[in-house]
Amino acid sequence: MKLAYWMYAGPAHIGTLRIASSFKNVHAIMHAPLGDDYFNVMRSMLEREQNFTPVTTSVVDRQVLSRGSQEKVVDNIVRKDGEETPDLIVLTPTCTSSILQEDLANFVDRAQMDAHCDVLLADVNHYRYNELQAGDRTLKQIVEFYIKKARKQGNLATEKTAKPSVNLIGFTTLGFHNQHDCTELKRLMADLGIEVNLILPEKATVDQLAKIPQAWFNLCPYREIGLMTAEYLQEEFAQPYVDITPMGVVETARCIRKMQQVLNQQGFDVNYEDFIQQQTRHVSQAAWFSRSIDCQNLTGKKAVVFGDNTHAAAMTKILAREMGIHVVLAGTYCKYDADWFRAEVSEYCDEVLISEDNGAIADAIARIEPAAIFGTQMERHVGKRLDIPCGVIAAPIHIQNFPLGYKPFLGYEGTNQIADLVYNSFTLGMEDHLLEIFGGHDTKEVITKGISSDSDLGWHSTAQAELNKVPGFVRGKVKRNTEKFARERGLSEITLEVMYAAKEAVGA
């Protein structure tokens, strides 16, 4: 065990609570000591929602430790059932309360006798899985539970819809731009003539889960959450799924072609090629922008990408393939799925880093000195410290990445947002040169008393001649660095030797 200053993926119970609180009219009871109950505060702070977070903590305190938890946990479940009248109550321990080794399944069976709603124990190993893995498992568990229940009651809808339809799986609370991505994918499906059968788990009710088999196929845009559910549905109902993330022009087209293939295989003849061409050439600005002179200014610039598997892999491909940016390092904190990530990004970057240690990523960024970083909130902090611009492309994120405006990352509108993010993350060439020549209004350290190009130091004629050989757009920088070097050493005149020594000291 080690003390973590920063965790990219939280503990398992956070994943379970994210799934439970994404559903409509589902309540979660967290069997935990005080200190593990920060989910409510985190969600109500970050998500722009009016409703309270449907999570209650059944506190493990001294009394519980001396008498056992059953009475308290069962009372809390029955009380919440009476107060909130949910369709389902999910009970989850945390890694701390798991140490008690209590028979929570027995508590659930006991509570089910008195509660009117369904009660389910989240079946997750809290020491083996992190937030994302636990979320994936909990979603599959809830879907499986209600499909079995519907089958038992004889109301499972297995007949396919008349028109092609899709289940969108993996949209959760606290996900990275999930609400915007969901809206964009609904628009995309409408343009393609595909009805949305169900969105899981965001805003779905558990009663609707019996309708899942009606859809012609499932779309899982995020690799972290939803894939286990899609695989289960494929085994159970031979329901195909598409797991290509439609992020960037190339991958969006590939995702649409895969959906076309799935529909054609089921006897529905569609051809989306004209739609792809129309969107790529005329609707999405990204393809046009990537050929413009503005984007060509970015060609060959160095970048570092780090995030979850879905966003880091997609972003690496977009930067390298669509914008000509040199991705020196691509990394992920999803160590459990490292092989997939390596296979996806190896040909698009120089180096692959798979780590949960924020220090290792910070050290790699400092060593590489990229022109821009694309990462999580943590990489944003690292960028601020090193004075390197950073675009946030993956969770974990802070409040500014839960925007009120419409900012999807998926689909064709997502390509525009990404192009803006990439372009605005790099310091523009002319801006850079003008700041160097004339000095900026936000210089962090004052090199001379003013920001004019007048100097209080004497320049020897040989040094002045050498300075004049330096290209104009960096001459001011060289002059300031040399004068700073001379001033620090108490020199009144700058000779050729001083100039060379300054150059060596700066490492130019």
Swiss-Prot record:
Pfam families: Oxidored_nitro, PCP_red. CDD domains: Pchlide_reductase_B. Substrate binds at G429, M430. GO terms for biological process: light-independent chlorophyll biosynthetic process; photosynthesis, dark reaction. Its cofactor is [4Fe-4S] cluster. Binds 1 [4Fe-4S] cluster per heterodimer. The cluster is bound at the heterodimer interface by residues from both subunits. Its EC number is 1.3.7.7. InterPro entries: ChlB/BchB/BchZ, LI-POR_suB-like_C, Nase/OxRdtase_comp1, P-CP_red_C, Protochl_reductB, Protochlorophyllide_Rdtase. SUPFAM superfamilies: Helical backbone' metal receptor. GO terms for molecular function: 4 iron, 4 sulfur cluster binding; ATP binding; metal ion binding; oxidoreductase activity, acting on iron-sulfur proteins as donors; oxidoreductase activity, acting on the CH-CH group of donors, iron-sulfur protein as acceptor. It catalyses: chlorophyllide a + oxidized 2[4Fe-4S]-[ferredoxin] + 2 ADP + 2 phosphate = protochlorophyllide a + reduced 2[4Fe-4S]-[ferredoxin] + 2 ATP + 2 H2O. [4Fe-4S] cluster binds at D36. The keyword Cytoplasm does not apply. Pathway: Porphyrin-containing compound metabolism; chlorophyll biosynthesis (light-independent). The active site is at D294. It comes from the Bacteria. Keywords: 4Fe-4S, ATP-binding, Chlorophyll biosynthesis, Iron, Iron-sulfur, Metal-binding, Nucleotide-binding, Oxidoreductase, Photosynthesis. Component of the dark-operative protochlorophyllide reductase (DPOR) that uses Mg-ATP and reduced ferredoxin to reduce ring D of protochlorophyllide (Pchlide) to form chlorophyllide a (Chlide). This reaction is light-independent. The NB-protein (ChlN-ChlB) is the catalytic component of the complex. Protochlorophyllide reductase is composed of three subunits; ChlL, ChlN and ChlB. Forms a heterotetramer of two ChlB and two ChlN subunits. Belongs to the ChlB/BchB/BchZ family. This is Light-independent protochlorophyllide reductase subunit B. It comes from Synechocystis sp. (strain ATCC 27184 / PCC 6803 / Kazusa). The lineage of its organism: Bacteria, Bacillati, Cyanobacteriota, Cyanophyceae, Synechococcales. The gene is chlB.
